[in-house]
């Protein structure tokens, strides 16, 4: 089954009456419809001939090219939408993919977004995030209960342009003139009074309506270019309105592809895309975004409204060539709804990239209402057009200077000029908050160059470099990976010259750090990547600890120029921790959407069907990771099979919610590690029931397409294979409920149960309800039964098994059970069973185990997404186990220098040597000719910087001096009065003189007694 794209229009509103919108999205493959992509642009007739020739030779007759009525029809295109009878579909696909001019064939997708609006008369402080999407108003009232008490009210600015000082650039004559901006949204009315330069409106939905029936497109356009009431940033920009969603909130992938092609034909400069979804593997969409930016279009996209959960970035904002925007409030706090990084494309073998790129205001922002006037909205789909409007303004100013702007140079300037928010990590804020004026100054002095994102790597810097700064490096540890984006402002295409070079600083013990570098050989469009694996050298002295430093040197050839750029790097090293304090996290056996339908772990959460947060310790298991670190444990991530780690280094292997199969070699390896090396294995599973999987499959009435899960919450049959050597197995029933263990309350959410366990082991049972029967329409009584859910077994090592992982997962967590993992770690560390596990012990009749054993779903499609199995003519077979990753050290040149403290700060871009900025007035004068700055503006600025500012400074200094003199006078006066009283003198000149002498002598005796030097 092909990857399904889930695209949502990220829309969160808090209007003048503070409307709260709940947004959901669904995406389905359209049955019997395929997008045929060609290797170039061809006219309609030519494309028809190519498809006809390919299908004619295969004997496929029942097919047709679907007509697309839109503004792009008159131009050549690089794709067609093809309908093929289901009977011939496999034949047709084979024939088409074999044609020399056909690049690929992918399913057509339908995207639907649902908005359910509730009006609330008071400001709603709880902003939309993934856990509450689609919930009813009762849940919102429950979430809002903490705001029933008094709290400080804050003023919300009425003009976002004033906050970001766009008016300063307006006074320079910079208003967006000459810049074409494409807005992909819900349309715009032609008669709306806020807009004066709507160059073109196009409808891509096929229903012939150009107006905005929802209001979102109007608001977005207003932030970019409104010229009255609630002002936009670039009122003179030329707006190109692309209506890509119907009023029923439906769209198709092909609509976007056509609209993107048209935007390229129209040579737009900037494109705002306030949509997104988790499917970064929808290749036609991703490819077309690359093509857009390769043609010089600066794309700004919302990062998503799925925060505060980590690993929730949306595509295309997570692409390297796109400016991904997160949201903040007006008090400069990260908005709760704003999606967090890291990217998850690179997992499990690699590590995610830094995203979002930048943040801006996205909470309670004023903008244009569909009916005229202004309203407020919140969401990253608001922050995105704020940045898009700012970029439009910047582009018009730079083009007026006769300079060139491209997607990379604009991104470099935004990142280098941003203001970092204190106490916020890089996966929340990116490079920081948008600074419009600083960005303009950077662009004004910009010269084409190559830069990094992040611009330096300091694994000792907390909080910004979280999670790297939370755990030092040590010998025998699994390499830590830092994934850096390379931005190429020289040209759309570049390539790496020679190889990157690691340059350790000898004065900072950089030679104790082993560095492995993998990188993209080519940079296209405008960007590439460099993955840095860091480990500790075996040459390091025993028990040595300290910081190490150096830099990585990379040379790029682009636009007939070789450009060398350095990435400063610093890390902390400690001696290896005790084995029992080291935990190995199994990432290799976690699978998620995309590409397949991997269902949710908690079946009670019906509005969130996909498991798409990567199940990583730095995404949806962030809370667990922080708890383990604060408890003194060191957590390492295994992105390879079990055959690739040394069990003698670790106290426990942690297997949480695995969906992948296990190699037979892995099962043998774990058995050996437990028996010979005392390794302990801790497993937290989830549900698996074939009937429930069939019950929760999707069926779309429009597309007539079934979407079947490829596994359950966990792959229980695979876990049973892993545990079979010990006589341990898990069952197919699904249970839920709430129970107590000791003085702790525990939520059990769609978990499995233990069906067999060694007699010498300990099994804990709790009273729960059968959720599987309820879902399947059986038991509606809510009857509770005793269910064995926790097993503890000791051989040479320990095996601990629990049936539900939701209490460790930040996604939909109700009450965490971190304490349970603490108790398990205490058990495997000391051998002493915590008292809390001695309650409700039961014995399991292993004779009945086979009755409850889970069976694999017949004809499931796990093999399409698995790294372990594949489908052959004889059935499902195991793939050869991959080789372990070897550490190939980077080319190294030791430098006899020390690190500069400025290296480990945001790196500045190189500037034009002719650009000499002495102060603001000189800077304005240098722009006067090209920016048409009026003499009045210069006079005002000159007066302020040349006369008013120094006078004001002098007045402040004199005021401070006067206050100090008065304070000293009153102090002496008080002491003089004390002296008169002590001497019994009157207020005469002689009396005052004697009183001062008395005070001086008295103070001198006291100070001498204290040893002061008088």
Model-derived segments and their meaning:
Residues 25, 157, 168-201, 207-252, ...:
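Subtilisin-like serine protease catalytic core
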Residues 221, 240, 244-245, 312-315, ...:
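Hydrolase catalytic cores
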């Amino acid at each position: 089954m092909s990857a399904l794209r889930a695209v949502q229009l990220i829309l969160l509103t808090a209007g003048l009456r503070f409307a709260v919108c709940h947004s959901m999205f669904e995406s389905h493959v359209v049955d019997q419809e395929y997008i045929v992509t060609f290797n170039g642009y061809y006219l309609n007739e030519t494309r028809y001939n190519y498809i006809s020739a390919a299908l004619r030779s295969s004997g496929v007759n029942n097919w047709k090219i679907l007509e697309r009525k839109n503004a792009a029809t008159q131009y050549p295109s690089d794709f067609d939408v093809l309908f093929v009878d289901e009977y011939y579909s496999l034949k047709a696909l084979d024939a088409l993919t074999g044609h020399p001019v056909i690049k690929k064939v992918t399913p057509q997708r339908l995207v639907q977004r649902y908005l359910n609006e509730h009006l609330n008369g008071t400001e709603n402080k709880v902003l939309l995030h993934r856990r509450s999407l689609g919930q009813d108003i009762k849940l919102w009232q429950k979430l809002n209960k903490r705001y029933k008490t008094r709290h400080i009210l804050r003023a919300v600015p009425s003009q976002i342009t004033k906050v970001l000082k766009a008016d300063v650039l307006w006074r320079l004559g910079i208003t967006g003139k000459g810049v074409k901006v494409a807005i992909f949204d819900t349309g715009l009315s032609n008669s709306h009074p806020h807009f004066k330069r709507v160059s073109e409106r196009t409808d891509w939905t096929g229903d012939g309506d150009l107006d905005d029936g929802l209001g979102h497109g109007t608001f977005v356009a207003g932030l970019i270019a409104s010229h009255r009431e609630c002002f936009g940033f670039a009122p003179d920009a030329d707006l190109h309105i692309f209506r890509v969603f119907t009023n029923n909130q439906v769209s198709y992938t092909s609509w976007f592809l056509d609209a993107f092609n048209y935007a390229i034909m129209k040579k737009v400069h900037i494109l705002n895309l306030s949509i997104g979804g988790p499917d970064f593997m929808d290749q036609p969409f991703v490819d077309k975004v690359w093509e857009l930016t390769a043609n010089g279009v600066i794309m700004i996209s919302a990062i998503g409204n799925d925060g505060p959960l980590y690993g929730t970035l949306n595509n295309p904002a997570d692409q390297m060539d796109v400016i991904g925007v997160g949201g903040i409030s007006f008090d400069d706090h990260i908005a709760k709804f704003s999606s967090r990084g890291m990217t998850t494309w690179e997992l499990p073998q690699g590590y995610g990239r830094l995203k979002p790129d930048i943040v801006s205001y996205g909470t309670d922002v004023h903008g244009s209402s569909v009916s005229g006037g202004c309203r407020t909205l919140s969401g990253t789909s608001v922050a995105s057009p704020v940045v898009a409007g700012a970029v439009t303004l910047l582009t018009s100013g730079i083009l007026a200077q006769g300079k060139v702007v491209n997607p990379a140079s604009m991104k470099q300037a935004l990142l280098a000029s941003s203001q970092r928010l204190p106490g916020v990590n890089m996966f929340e804020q990116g490079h920081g908050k948008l600074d419009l004026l600083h960005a303009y100054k950077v662009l004004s002095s910009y010269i084409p160059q190559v830069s990094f994102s992040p611009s330096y790597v300091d694994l000792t810097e907390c909080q910004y470099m979280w999670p790297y700064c939370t755990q030092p490096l040590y010998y025998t540890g699994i390499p830590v990976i830092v994934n850096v984006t390379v931005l190429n402002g020289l040209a759309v295409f570049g390539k790496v010259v020679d190889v990157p070079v690691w340059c350790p600083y000898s004065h900072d013990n950089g030679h104790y750090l082993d560095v492995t570098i993998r990188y993209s050989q080519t940079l296209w469009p405008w960007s590439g990547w460099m993955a840095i694996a860091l480990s500790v050298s075996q040459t390091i002295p025993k028990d040595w600890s300290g910081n190490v430093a150096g830099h990585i040197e990379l040379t790029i050839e682009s636009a007939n120029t070789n450009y060398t750029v350095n990435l400063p790097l610093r890390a902390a090293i400690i001696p290896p921790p005790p084995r029992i304090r080291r935990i190995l996290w199994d990432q290799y056996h976690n699978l998620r959407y995309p590409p397949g339908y991997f269902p949710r772990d908690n079946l009670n959460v019906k509005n969130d069907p996909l498991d798409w947060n990567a199940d990583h310790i730095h995404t949806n298991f962030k809370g667990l990771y922080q708890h383990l670190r604060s408890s003194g444990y060191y957590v390492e991530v295994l992105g390879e099979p079990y055959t690739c780690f040394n069990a003698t280094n670790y106290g426990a292997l942690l297997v949480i919610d695995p969906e992948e199969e296990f190699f037979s070699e892995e099962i043998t390896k774990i058995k050996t590690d437990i028996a010979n090396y005392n390794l302990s294995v801790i497993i937290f599973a989830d549900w698996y029931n074939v009937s429930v999987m069939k019950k929760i499959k999707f069926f779309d009435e429009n597309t007539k397409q079934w979407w079947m899960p490829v596994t359950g919450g966990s792959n229980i049959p695979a876990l049973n294979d892993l545990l079979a050597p010990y006589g341990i197995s898990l069952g197919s029933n699904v249970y839920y409920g709430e129970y107590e263990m000791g003085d702790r309350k525990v939520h059990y959410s769609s978990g499995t149960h233990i069906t067999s366990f060694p007699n010498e082991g300990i099994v804990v049972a709790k009273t729960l309800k059968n959720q599987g029967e309820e879902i399947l329409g059986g038991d509606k009584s809510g009857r509770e039964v005793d269910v064995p859910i926790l097993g503890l077994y000791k051989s040479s090592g320990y095996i601990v098994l629990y049936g539900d992982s939701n209490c460790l997962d930040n996604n939909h967590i109700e009450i965490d059970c971190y304490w349970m993992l603490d108790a398990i770690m205490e058990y495997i560390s000391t051998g002493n069973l915590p008292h809390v596990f001695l309650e409700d012990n039961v014995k399991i009749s292993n004779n009945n185990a086979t009755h409850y054993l889970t069976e694999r779903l017949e004809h499931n499609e796990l093999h399409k997404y698995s790294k372990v199995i594949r489908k052959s003519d004889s059935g499902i077979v195991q793939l050869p186990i991959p080789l372990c990753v070897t550490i190939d050290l980077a080319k190294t040149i030791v430098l006899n220098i020390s690190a500069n403290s400025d290296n480990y700060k945001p790196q500045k871009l190189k500037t034009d040597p002719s650009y000499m900025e002495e102060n603001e007035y000189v800077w304005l004068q240098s722009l006067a000719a090209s920016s048409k700055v009026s003499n009045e503006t210069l006079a005002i600025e000159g007066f302020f910087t040349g006369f008013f500012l120094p006078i004001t400074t002098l007045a402040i200094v004199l005021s401070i001096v006067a206050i100090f003199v008065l304070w000293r006078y009153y102090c002496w006066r008080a002491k003089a009065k004390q002296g008169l009283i002590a001497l019994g003198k009157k207020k005469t000149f002689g009396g005052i003189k004697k009183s001062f002498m008395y005070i001086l002598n008295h103070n001198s005796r006291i100070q001498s007694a204290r040893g002061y030097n008088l």
